[in-house]
Every structure is written in structure tokens, then in C-alpha cells.
């Protein structure tokens, strides 16, 4: 069985965690690229806050290259087989790193800024922006990493403007089809 990577991309609060939930329910391993930053943040700052996370994010890219987070994620997954999900890809440079190791597709989750802002406010995650200006600032930081390009080149798109159940069903069906396709491709070859 070959490795097949589903790269999940979306702006903050778009609903990427719904895709992770659907993946876990299908028994697929999920890797979060944010975990690499979380580990580096503890190493560099000894404390994890949204500010130290953001600073680490910028710092490691500058020090070790735009592809660093993807390379670190690859170290964890390259021995894996079958369909896996990687949450949080942010640039085409990162996409290229994954493409070298396996067949990949990009699954994007989209919701309008207004919807994302309302949902972020409700989820009450520490460090989330609580006003429109900070929300826009965070969006721009993500876009500077190149996230907009990844979303523009997505193979699949979930528009998450309806209910959570609807988005979950969309994600579940896409992932299930990919699992079936990968199984078929492997039995053919
Ligand atoms: N369709 C929906 N209806 C209502 N609430 C939703 C919907 N989709 C997501 N949410 C809620 O909106 C919030 C943001 O979603 P989620 O945390 O999945 O976003 P994310 O893309 O993982 O964000 P980040 O990149 O910031 O981690 C969560 O509290 C989630 O439960």
C-alpha cells in the first residue's frame, strides 16, 4: 500500500478540525503541522502562547527555510502507508515537500471572513483575536506565508457556511472516496 497524503488547508476558523474529525472517524492518522511549531516553541521560549507560537513560526522559516515545518512533518510520516491527513499546510513550498514523498491532494475548507470571525469569537480559544482588526491582521499573516495559493490550487473544496453536520458529511465523503481510490490503485498495480 502506497502513502497518499491529504493536505488540508484553510484560513483560521474555516473549520479544518471538522476534516480531522471525519478522518479520525474513518480510522485515518492525522498529523497537525502546528504540532511542529508547538514543539519548537517550547524549545525556543519554554512557554506556549499565541505570540510565542507566531514568533516561532516566523523564526524557524527564516532560520531553517520555508520548507522546514513540512520537512519535520515528513520525518514523522514517511514510513506510513495508506491514506493519511496532514492538517495546516500553509504554502506551495510545503506542498512541494509532500509531493516528493507521496501522491497528494489538497482539500481546502472555506468560509467567509464574517463567518470565521463569528465562529472564532464563539470558540473562545486562548489567543484568538477578539476584535475585527486583530482578526484581519492574523488573516494577513497567514496569507503572507502563501496560504491563499494553496487554497487556490485545491483539488477539493468544502464550503463551510452551513451546519457542522453538513461540513462533516462533505469531508467524510471526500475522504472515504480517496481511501477507496487508493485501495483500488494499489490492487491494480
Ligand atoms: N458549520 C459550522 N457551524 C457552526 N460552527 C462551526 C462550523 N464549522 C466550524 N464551526 C466552529 O467554528 C470554530 C472554528 O472551526 P475550527 O476550529 O474547526 O477551525 P480551524 O480551521 O481548525 O481553525 P484554526 O486554523 O484557527 O485552528 C470551531 O469552534 C468550530 O466548532
Curated annotation (Swiss-Prot):
Q: Does the keyword Nucleotide-binding apply?
A: yes
- The record lists ATP as bound by 10-17
- What keywords tag this UniProt record? ATP-binding, Nucleotide-binding
Q: Which GO terms describe its molecular function?
A: ATP binding
Q: Name one Pfam family in it.
A: AAA_17
Reply yes or no: does the keyword ATP-binding apply.
yes
Tell me which family the UniProt entry assigns to this protein: Belongs to the UPF0200 family.
Q: What is this protein called?
A: UPF0200 protein Smar_1234
Q: Which organism is it from?
A: Staphylothermus marinus (strain ATCC 43588 / DSM 3639 / JCM 9404 / F1)
Amino acid at each position: 500500500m502506497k502513502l497518499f497524503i491529504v493536505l488540508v488547508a484553510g484560513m483560521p476558523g474555516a473549520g479544518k478540525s471538522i476534516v480531522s474529525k471525519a478522518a479520525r472517524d474513518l480510522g485515518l492518522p492525522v498529523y497537525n503541522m502546528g504540532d511542529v511549531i508547538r514543539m519548537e516553541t517550547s524549545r525556543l521560549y519554554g512557554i506556549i502562547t499565541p505570540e510565542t507560537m507566531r514568533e516561532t513560526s516566523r523564526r524557524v522559516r527564516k532560520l531553517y527555510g520555508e520548507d522546514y515545518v513540512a520537512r519535520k512533518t515528513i520525518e514523522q510520516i514517511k514510513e506510513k502507508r495508506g491514506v493519511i491527513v496532514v492538517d495546516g499546510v500553509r504554502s506551495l513550498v510545503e506542498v512541494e515537500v509532500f509531493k516528493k514523498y507521496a501522491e497528494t491532494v489538497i482539500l481546502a475548507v472555506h468560509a467567509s471572513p464574517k463567518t470565521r470571525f463569528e465562529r472564532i469569537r464563539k470558540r473562545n480559544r486562548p489567543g484568538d483575536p477578539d476584535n475585527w482588526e486583530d482578526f484581519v491582521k492574523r488573516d494577513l499573516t497567514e496569507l503572507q506565508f502563501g496560504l491563499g495559493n494553496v487554497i487556490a490550487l485545491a483539488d477539493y473544496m468544502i464550503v463551510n457556511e452551513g451546519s457542522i453536520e453538513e461540513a462533516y458529511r462533505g469531508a467524510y465523503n471526500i475522504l472515504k472516496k480517496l481511501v477507496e481510490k487508493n485501495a483500488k490503485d494499489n490492487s491494480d498495480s
